[in-house]
Amino acid sequence: MFDSCRRDIHYLRLSVIDRCNLRCRYCMPDGAKILEHEEVLTHEEFLRLAALFAQCGIDTVRVTGGEPLVRKSVAQLVAGLKATPGIRHVSMTTNGTLLAQQLPALLDAGLDSVNISLDTLDPAVFRHITARDEFASVQAGLRAALESPLPVKLNCVPQVGVNEGELEAIAALARDNDLQVRFIEMMPIGYGAAMPCVSGPELRARFANRWPELHPVEGTTFGNGPAVYYTVPGWKGSIGFIAAVHGKFCASCNRVRLTSQGFLRPCLASETGCDLRALLRGGADDARLRTAIRETIWSKPREHHFEDRCMPATRSMYRIGG
């Protein structure tokens, strides 16, 4: 369906859990408050809402967290989403630590693609960022994904003074692998709001200096997102840039977000939205829920104001769905 700005909203980011087995410094550091189990939607509630979203025009769902693979029987939820009439594509964003062992079940469930978050190729830096010694597990998950039939993307958040020196090495993973390596600007939300941002344009210029033949990939977007892709002659994969702060792409935004608590956010940066869990558990029928979904999508803000770096400190990416 269309929002009030005539944008075609057909993509739902579905945060199925706020918990995570890593403690990334910009997302969910040690001490972050987690929800009680009863506060999180059940599989049945997620699937009921997914069917209603599909009836409102959503055809693409990305399963996120927290870390979605921490959720018990998440492959069953993926299978349920794939079986929902109207939903044609189901993908997942994961930190990769549990992916190697769960990938067979996810493939059986019909998962269409996977994004893996990895900010470093150095085990010591990985521990600094995540406060956990799980680098080998992520490597295993990435290898398993690349050996599977799934399209794979790797998400990296450049961090000043942390992983700046290895960004070329991370980008070069696309040289020998059929892989889209995307560099995502630090979101000025929650814990990340206090951290300096490496801008997408700055990084693109740096890579162009390293690889003078770097050029835009024409004719494909590798999915439904805002990344702008580049490649180098002879490379198997490509490099993507998602510059939410320094390259605002709100005019073409096609998505909304449902948190694990059932709160529908029409915009990552907005405080507005609708508590669908309250309606669900309050006995609302499908017609009432569809109306709430449509009204919330219609009210999607024209644009964010990340450039002002004024997001409330109480907001956290692991709660919203990163």
How should these model regions be labeled?
Residues 16, 35, 67-71, 159-163, ...:
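Short, small-residue-enriched loops and turns at beta-alpha junctions
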Residues 23, 27, 71, 124, ...:
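Residues that scaffold the ATP/ADP-binding catalytic core of kinase and kinase-like folds
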Residues 22, 123-124, 248, 274:
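Glycine-centered loop/turn positions within well-structured domains
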Residues 40-63, 70-184:
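Radical SAM/AdoMet-radical enzyme domain recognition
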